[in-house]
Amino acid sequence: MGSTSTPDSSTNRLQDKVAIITGGAGGIGETTAKLFVRYGAKVVIADIADDHGQKVCNNIGSPDVISFVHCDVTKDEDVRNLVDTTIAKHGKLDIMFGNVGVLSTTPYSILEAGNEDFKRVMDINVYGAFLVAKHAARVMIPAKKGSIVFTASISSFTAGEGVSHVYTATKHAVLGLTTSLCTELGEYGIRVNCVSPYIVASPLLTDVFGVDSSRVEELAHQAANLKGTLLRAEDVADAVAYLAGDESKYVSGLNLVIDGGYTRTNPAFPTALKHGLA
């Protein structure tokens, strides 16, 4: 899986596929939409940011190739409409990329974390993923095929000080949902996987913390295990395209970790050792 900036001989790897991308009005979703269209897919992006979503579509391609549908993933009727609109327009659904996710906006400490904020993040990150999968499965089961991909996080199987408890809990839940759905839907030829990226300087982070993308990348690089390069939205999009397409036709239940080995290391140990020997 090379960078999307590198010429790829498999430019038609998603030819004639129909994909829905939730959270498609920016960040990883927008980048993935661009890549999917480049690879020959018909794409419907969904978001609550109508102006941004329509602008993304206008910038990428014509309405017959990419279109926008307003969708709040916490509302069953919105997700149902999203899938039904896609079927009406394109006749099928091959790929569902459940990419919506939000961060907590309250303090890290369990004593200070907001109750309503916890419910909000859980609702969007987990219930939203559930609804997206439910309505994708509704049309994929009769077709006996399909690929569902979720955006998880390295927080789906790790935890760290400063990363909110609710965000960590929701991403663990997304990984659990991936595994559980894989178990049920395999019978119908439907694959279910997720991607777990390290830090990406997306609007999700820059907007919440009020810093620009270069500062996020600087901090991410300082903490990273793999030096000399940065993880960008294009790299995550490459991973999603792999899981969405036929190249991964026998891959299901996978949590594809994109972290440069970060979660395979224990940065606290060498730091403590250095201080101890100083």
UniProtKB/Swiss-Prot annotation:
CDD domains reported for this sequence: secoisolariciresinol-DH_like_SDR_c
One BP term from GO: lignan biosynthetic process
Effect of residue 153 to A: Strongly reduces enzyme activity
Impact when changing residue 171 to A: Abolishes enzyme activity
Reactions listed under catalytic activity: (-)-secoisolariciresinol + 2 NAD(+) = (-)-matairesinol + 2 NADH + 2 H(+)
EC number: 1.1.1.331
PROSITE patterns for the chain: ADH_SHORT
Residues of the active site: 167
Keyword Nucleotide-binding: yes
Pfam families in the record: adh_short_C2
Binding-site residues for substrate, renumbered to this chain: 104, 164
Alphabetic keyword roster: NAD, Nucleotide-binding, Oxidoreductase
Entries under InterPro entries matching the protein: ABA2-like, NAD(P)-bd_dom_sf, Sc_DH/Rdtase_CS, SDR_fam
Annotated residues for binding of NAD(+): 23-28, 47, 73, 99, 171, 200
Disulfide-linked positions: none
GO molecular function: nucleotide binding; secoisolariciresinol dehydrogenase activity
Family, per entry: Belongs to the short-chain dehydrogenases/reductases (SDR) family.
Subunit structure: Homotetramer.
Function, in words: Oxidoreductase involved in lignan biosynthesis. Catalyzes the stereospecific conversion of (-)-secoisolariciresinol to (-)-matairesinol via a lactol intermediate.
Name of this chain's protein: Secoisolariciresinol dehydrogenase
Species of provenance: Podophyllum peltatum (American mandrake)
